[in-house]
From Swiss-Prot:
PROSITE patterns, per database record: IF_ROD_1, IF_ROD_2
Chain residue ranges for the region called Linker 1: 132-142
SUPFAM superfamilies: Intermediate filament protein, coiled coil region
Positions of post-translational Phosphotyrosine modification: Y469
Protein name per the record: Peripherin
Compartmental location: Cytoplasm, Cytoskeleton; Cell projection, Axon; Perikaryon
Any one GO BP annotation for this protein: intermediate filament organization
Length: 469
């Protein structure tokens, strides 16, 4: 058997059975040796076939040329030398028999050990084939199935993430539009507030102008009243002076009375026309100023009312936009929180899937290590079996050498005992043996060992001729 390195080596194993016959009574038995690689001992080892048998209890000498049995004569012989040689030979044979029995026991133990190792080898080979054919495929199938599930879940999570990102982008655009609208409304509000401040300033200026005009009107009215009073006093003074002059100058008055009266009437009419004209001009100026101020006040009041309405409307719009922005901000925060939760969940699931993949890889590595260990054990068993086969072959050669060495004194002892014989012819006996040979071939193909077994039946015929002493 050669080392498994790609060359084909065959190992033939057969079963052996020990048979022990009765102890020899007269003389040591003979050993029959077959021409094949198997050997059989007439006293120690029997053939594997049930048809083979061994006869014990008679000493057989060398086979005669004609196959006839030679018998000793009935006369008395001198067996003193033969008895001494026989005793010495018996002692030697007993020692050799004991050694052969020990060798036979060891050989039987080796055979049992080889059978046990073959059974273990077959079991390990079955486990190895099962592990090689099923476990890696099943582990690979489980890994591929889990990887497909992980890829499908990753795709689902990726689509969900894309959808959430699209929603987030849409909400971000809506939020940006609302922020821009809010900025525009805030700018409009600021413009309205600025216009309101300007309008308030104009109203204040108009109010101050109105108050100033009212004060001017009051001063003019006071001046008119003062002028009226002054005119009346002048008229009274003039009348008093005229009356005094009338008392003093009665005659003069009598002569100039019509001219003075006419002059007084003219002066009165002139002053009255001047006063009426001044009063009318003051009233018209006051009315025009009052109308202008009233129109300005009305215009300012209307502008103020419109500004207040616009401010209220802007305030309502700002409040509604603020509420809408707050709602959108809350929605955005909820979506961001949901996105973070999805990312965390995705990270956890990805970590779990990576841990599962690592666990499966570790199991696959352990299975590969176990397969390698089984292969090493199988190789060690093959090495042990090869060593046992070598040892068995060595013991076989030793037994064959001992058998050939022991057969020499038997022939010499038989030649000493034979003198004159009367030949009696007996038919030769043939022993048929059938042996089942198990041929196991171990080949190495692409780094893998392939073991094939076959059984072969061998037939052998052993001619046995009776011998006598």
């Amino acid at each position: 058997m050669s080392h498994p390195s790609g060359l084909r080596s065959s190992v033939s194993s057969t079963s052996y059975r020990r048979t022990f016959g009765p102890p020899p009574s007269l003389s040591p038995g003979a050993f029959s040796y077959s021409s094949s690689s198997r050997f059989s001992s007439s006293r120690l080892l029997g053939s594997a076939s049930p048809g083979s048998s061994v006869r014990l209890g008679s000493f057989r000498g060398p086979r005669a040329g004609t196959g006839a049995l030679l018998r000793l004569p009935s006369e008395r012989l001198d067996f003193s030398m033969a008895e001494a040689l026989n005793q010495e030979f018996l002692a030697t044979r007993s020692n050799e028999k004991q050694e052969l029995q020990e060798l036979n026991d060891r050989f039987a133990n080796f055979i049992e050990k080889v059978r046990f190792l073959e059974q273990q080898n077959a079991a390990l080979r079955g486990e190895l084939n099962q592990a090689r054919g099923q476990e890696p495929a099943r582990a690979d199938q489980l890994c591929q199935q889990e990887l497909r599930e992980l890829r499908r879940e990753l795709e689902l999570l990726g689509r969900e993430r894309d959808r959430v990102q699209v929603e987030r982008d849409g909400l971000a655009e809506d939020l940006a539009a609302l922020k821009q609208r809010l900025e525009e409304e805030t700018r409009k509000r600021e413009d309205a507030e600025h216009n309101l401040v300007l309008f308030r300033k104009d109203v204040d200026d108009a109010t101050l102008s109105r108050l100033e005009l009212e004060r001017k009107i009051e001063s003019l009215m006071d001046e008119i009243e003062f002028l009226k009073k002054l005119h009346e006093e002048e008229l009274r003074d003039l009348q008093l002076s005229v009356e005094s002059q009338q008392v003093q100058h009665v005659e003069v008055e009598a002569t100039v009375k019509p001219e003075l009266t006419a002059a007084l009437r003219d002066i009165r009419a002139q002053y009255e026309s001047i006063a009426a004209k001044n009063l009318q001009e003051a009233e018209e100026w006051y009315k025009s100023k009052y109308a202008d101020l009233s129109d300005a006040a009305n215009r300012n009041h209307e502008a103020l009312r419109q500004a207040k309405q616009e401010m209220n409307e802007s305030r309502r719009q700002i409040q509604s936009l603020t509420c809408e922005v707050d709602g959108l901000r809350g929605t955005n925060e909820a979506l961001l929180r949901q996105l973070r939760e999805l990312e965390e969940q995705f990270a956890l699931e990805a970590g779990g899937y990576q841990a599962g993949a690592a666990r499966l890889e570790e199991e696959l590595r352990q299975l590969k290590e176990e397969m390698a260990r089984h292969l090493r054990e199988y190789q060690e068993l093959l090495n042990v079996k090869m060593a046992l086969d070598i040892e068995i072959a060595t013991y076989r050669k030793l037994l064959e050498g001992e058998e050939s060495r022991i057969s020499v004194p038997v022939h010499s002892f038989a030649s000493l005992s034979i003198k004159t014989t009367v030949p009696e012819v007996e038919p030769p006996q043939e022993t048929h043996s059938r042996k089942m040979v198990l041929i196991r071939t171990i080949e190495t193909r692409d780094g893998e060992q392939v073991v094939t077994e076959s059984q072969k039946e061998q037939h052998s015929e052993l001619d046995k001729s009776p011998q006598s002493y």
